[in-house]
Amino acid sequence: NCCIPAPEPAVDCKIPPDSVMKGKHGRRTQESIDRANELLDKFVKTLEGRGIKVDRPTPLKFDEKIATPDWEVEHMFGCMPSRDVIITVGKEMLEATMSFRCRWFEYLAYRPLLQKYFIEDPGMRHETAPKPRLTDKDYHMNYLSEDVSIEQRLKWAEKKYFVTTEEEPLFDAADILRFGKDLIVQHGFTTNLKGIDWLTRHFPDHRIHTVNFPGDPYPIHIDATFTPIRPGLILNNPVRKLPQEQRKLFEDNGWEIVYAAQPAHNSPPDLSYYSVWLSMNVLVLDPCLLYTSDAADD
């Protein structure tokens, strides 16, 4: 039941004016859903073949209307990667606030697994961040204008002016990278400064470092921008470079930052929210083995 999201403040600003997704929303085609499930099933078998136990979320009725006392949207998004919704730090699994209305209830797909882990492991901690109301006060509505050029969006990104306001704490788990006792958090569309402040208070035994990438006019999640692939080595998107003053933290601690190769594709698939830089979104199994999509350059 995966869907193309209906219009809402956090979603609209992500869709470029020339995208074929403009004006389209609703349940994705059965063909695309079946193909995605086929790829997922194949990947699960690959991981299980390496002795890895794979747990999968419980689907919801993503194509039905959802609402809170403050808003309603025609349907949900779908069940995206668990790392969007949940950040695991030691024995704790923390549900993020999320910043898209269509993803507000997505955590429910993972609740059966979280309950299972809680029962099986006496040391497991299941935590949830305060759910935001996501009223219009949470968004800069001028971000919705189709008249805003990419050049203007880049200027806004450089000034750290994003679609989300500081009305209440907001963060997606996919904006967080874990480096032992250091957590790197991207400030952008889906995580605001109040969200980073909340994380700082919640993890007092960790050091929280805020980063941003001025070259990204749509800064949603850090995975296709800044990716650690083994101890001491990080891939950085050459279009979304980490500012020089923020590189110092990594370089002073022995981390080399290298720019990723150009993706094999020049444009993302139709009806896709992802950029060609999805090639950087890899799964690292160990320091010598990682999995990437076919968007990567050989």
What does each model-found stretch correspond to?
Residues 1-298:
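The feature marks the mature, well-folded catalytic cores of soluble enzymes
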